[in-house]
Regions:
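Flexible, gly/pro- and Lys/Arg-enriched active-site loops
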Residues: 2-21, 59, 73-83, 93-188
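Solvent-exposed residues in well-ordered beta-strands and their adjoining turns
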Residues: 37, 90-92
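A structural preference for short, hydrophobic beta-strand core positions in alpha/beta folds
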Residues: 64-65, 185
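N-terminal beta1-alpha1 ligand-phosphate binding loop
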Residues: 4-60, 66-70
Length: 188
């Protein structure tokens, strides 16, 4: 029997969903949650293909992918709706290296950073990395607005219902704050 099985305190409840499935990474690995979004060039296909690309990242393993969701754009409204999902990864990459790998995937999918809230072929955001709080010029984890966005919270809670946002508490506690944001589940 593993040390974790002998000592329930070593399996944090924030990593266990209601079905009892454990997202705790193996020793030497980290748990990261990544938001996926697209609203150009067949966005459903873009998000599905991007999830495949996440599964092929060096030193990383895709553990879970939420259903796809349709949401209205944030900021600049005169653009197509977004297709969104959230993925759980186990990774041996440090957070900054994982962020660089996500940027590389975005570039593979033709992402251009023209202006804030611009339409995009693919957007990948590192939401959470273990329970770390990182505030650097290149990376803020937890993502600073994740608790205010239905397109992040709803798919995140689908794959990790007990998830905690460091410094903010249970992700589920923020659902009332986003209840006015339209979100439509499309498929698994």
């Amino acid at each position: 029997m593993s040390e974790r099985a002998d000592n329930p305190q070593l399996t944090p409840t924030w990593l266990t969903d209601v079905a009892g499935d454990d997202l705790t990474p193996p020793a030497g690995w980290h748990l990261a949650f990544v938001a996926l979004g697209a609203n150009l060039d067949d966005p459903q296909q873009q998000v599905r293909a991007a999830s495949d690309a996440l599964g092929e990242l060096s030193d990383s393993r895709l553990q879970r992918l939420s259903s796809l969701y349709r949401t209205a754009p944030v900021g600049v409204r005169a653009q197509p709706d977004f297709i969104n999902a959230v993925a759980a990864l186990h990774s041996r990459l440090p957070p900054e290296s994982l962020l660089e790998a996500l940027f590389a995937v975005e570039r593979q999918f033709g992402r251009r950073r023209e202006f804030h809230h611009a339409p995009r072929t693919l957007d990948l955001d590192l939401l959470l990395y273990d329970r770390q709080c990182i505030d650097s010029p290149r990376l803020c984890v937890p993502h600073p607005r994740m608790h205010l966005r239905a397109f992040v919270l709803v798919p995140l809670l689908e794959i990790a219902p007990g998830c905690l946002i460091p410094g903010r508490g249970p992700a589920a506690a923020w659902l009332p704050a986003v209840s006015g944001q339209a979100i439509q589940r499309l498929s698994r």
